[in-house]
Amino acid sequence: MDITLHTTNLKQFRTSLYQNFNNRADTLIDLLDAMCSVPNAKSVVEYSLASCYQRSYSTIFKAIDELTLAELWLPHRVGPYLPKPEKWPFWLLIADVTTSPRPYAHTLEDRGMVYQPEVVKGKLPVTIGHQYSTVALGLEPEPGVSCSWVLPLQSERVATTEDKEMVGCRQIERLMQETKLPFGQDLTVEVGDSSYSKPAYLHAHRKFPNLVTIARVRGNRKFYYPYVPTQEKTKKRSQGRPRQYGERFSLPDPATWTEPNETHTLWETSRRGKVYRVEIQAWHNLLMSGKNKPERLPMHKYPFTLVRIVRYDEEGNEAFKHPLWLIVMGERRHELTLEHIYQAYLCRFDIEHFFRFGKQNLLLVDFQTPEVKREENWWQLVHIAYAQLWMARHVAEALPRPWERNLPAMKQRLNSPTLVQRDFARIIRQLGTPAQPPKPRGNSPGRRQGMKLPKRPRQMVVVKGKKATQVA
């Protein structure tokens, strides 16, 4: 591995960040370095205590407040360093939504009911806060690098008046329409969970011939075979609209299934050494029912491939209670093998590692501000910091703690985001920073004596499906 090449790329990437920050570029570079090198900060203001942060703590909030980035700012910065897929014949985009709980921010605007997992069984997994949609690039495994990496490209807050899946749809459309990025010209696969299998989302992306959508579907869905008219009905002239759907294909009813058009068997070994047999079945050219409201969605024009995946243990028993159902929709879906489809959907879970790392190590949801714009800017900064850690993945050295030295992952020396963050302070000391040293200008006069700021107004909590709103 040529360490000089990776070091040069990291320097160029940091210089590009510095040159494209419109306001307070020196402060933002120092803040990003502090975020990437301090894994145990408890609050955002603690980043001012890092050795690489040369300024006072108040400049952190001024820089966050004045941050202005374009919609495709981060994709343009990482575009020259995107690793072209070699094992896969496609680019992989992962879309998902995560929550930012803010139940006690009574003056924060546009809060709604969002999902939050609960440890205690029986409690409603609901809290008050915001939702953010993230689109990341799925990456192929690299030697010496952990497979949990993704490359975040876009982050956008989901307003209470918007559909979270359609926000992700809009983000992917920007990536597909940008000519400076390779996604619109090459075969691109997007993956999502069951909420992304709705007709509105699938229909919106059919205008891109190079885009293939892989989405999980619930086990109670119902699809249809294409309608094939008989000879008698062909001779008989009928009035009205021609029939579009054939026999029913009900996922919970195996009696409605036909023989699959394609099958494939894989063997997998877990981390604990258990061997599993994966059976993949596919039915081609199925149809789903469309919608008439709020707009007409003629889904009968877009056939798809239905995939059923079942995993068996060494004794032949099903490893999971329910099978995994996937739909594959797009003009170029036939270029994907069943193994490609299976591997692409497995990579969807890598974005969960990014959310977990961001919340635990980068304070993704810990910036307590009453301003929506500042919260959105902070989310953008966390995505940029994670991208900088990804750029340093080949430069960092694995630094396990004393009780971690004998772990299998440490013996393999696979650089994960956590290990790169531990070593990032050393990297910065060796490479230096493009930021200029601060120029103290003395103490500010501050507010005049006797000045009192008005109280912030309390905001309503948006509860969908009800006429009245709830007071926080």
Feature map (PLM): residue ranges:
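Single, function-defining residue in the core of a domain
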Residues: 1-17, 21-24, 40, 106, ...
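Contiguous, well-ordered alpha-helical segments that form the cores/surfaces of helical PPI scaffolds
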Residues: 30-34, 136, 382-386
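A generic secondary-structure signal
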Residues: 34, 50, 80-81, 174-179
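Short gly/ser-rich anion-binding loops that grip negatively charged ligand groups
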Residues: 37, 50, 88, 121-125, ...
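Hydrophobic, well-ordered secondary-structure segments
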Residues: 59-62, 73-84, 166-174, 187
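Active-site-proximal, Lys/Arg-enriched surface segment
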Residues: 64-146, 152-153, 292
